[in-house]
A protein has these predicted regions:
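Active-site pocket scaffolds in enzymes
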Residues: 201
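Catalytic-core "active-site belt" of small-molecule-metabolizing enzymes
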Residues: 1-189, 193, 197, 205-234
């Protein structure tokens, strides 16, 4: 099959402690999926978080111990680095039950869902979130840890540091819709498939980012990821 120009490269994420790579098909995300405390979380059970898609080429795998330098995009008033637990699917389907949804999870990683706050001139009036969510290099992720080697049966800590100061100290216990519930919800609207990646939402009180800021996030038992915001011309 002749191409007019080289096709885009397949987005991939390395598998931890393996020579294999996880091929990315689609990238889904969830918003407003954490409560500030357990009581509020229980009150909101049954709430379906808003969901969105990011382009697969937003995915950037970051090596363990490395700091990902991400340039502030143009025409941006501020950037919000949403640090999240990420589910990676090894199979999919439609209208999945919770048990089926759980069985779809091949592995886990951590990642940042960068969100752009647009200048007032460019802000869409009630339109889609594409300009805010699909950013060049706007979804850096760690290596994927296979689900069979991961225990998420109990809540785990989700922490984010900005310039070595702890700015988020949360737990997956504060998650309103569990990863399985998110997967089941998504499967009602799209046919999920192997290679789909799902950002499960960020804890409340996500900090703003300025040029020069260094963020270091971790999910207990899954991984950590360090980034620095740099100027566009860096």
């Amino acid at each position: 099959m002749p191409f007019l120009f080289a096709p885009a490269m397949q987005a991939v994420i390395p598998v931890r402690d393996s020579a294999d790579f996880f091929p990315v098909r689609r990238v889904y995300g969830a918003a407003k999926n954490y409560a500030p405390d357990i009581a509020t979380c229980k009150e909101k059970k049954g709430f379906n978080p808003p969901v969105f898609l990011k382009s697969p080429d937003c995915i950037v795998p970051v090596q363990d111990g490395a700091t990902y330098l991400w340039p502030m995009p143009p025409r941006t008033s501020k950037i919000v680095p949403e640090f999240e637990l990420v589910a990676c699917l090894g199979k999919g389907g439609r209208n999945l039950t919770l048990d089926q949804a759980k069985d779809c999870i091949w592995g886990w990683c951590v990642g940042y869902d960068f969100t752009r706050r647009l200048t007032e001139k460019d802000l869409p009036t009630g339109g889609p979130w594409d300009m805010m969510k699909t950013l060049d290099g706007g979804a850096p992720v760690s290596a994927v840890r296979p689900a069979q080697k991961t225990d998420l049966s109990n809540p785990v800590a989700v922490r984010l540091y900005r310039n070595r100061e702890l700015v988020q100290d949360a737990s997956t216990e504060f998650m309103i819709a569990s990863p399985e519930e998110l997967i089941a919800q998504l499967s009602c609207f799209w046919e999920l498939r192997a290679g789909d990646v799902i950002f499960t939402g960020a804890p409340v009180n996500v900090p703003d980012a300025r040029i020069g800021d260094v963020f270091d996030g971790s999910v207990e038992g899954i991984g950590s990821l360090k980034i620095q915001i740099v100027s566009e011309n860096n």
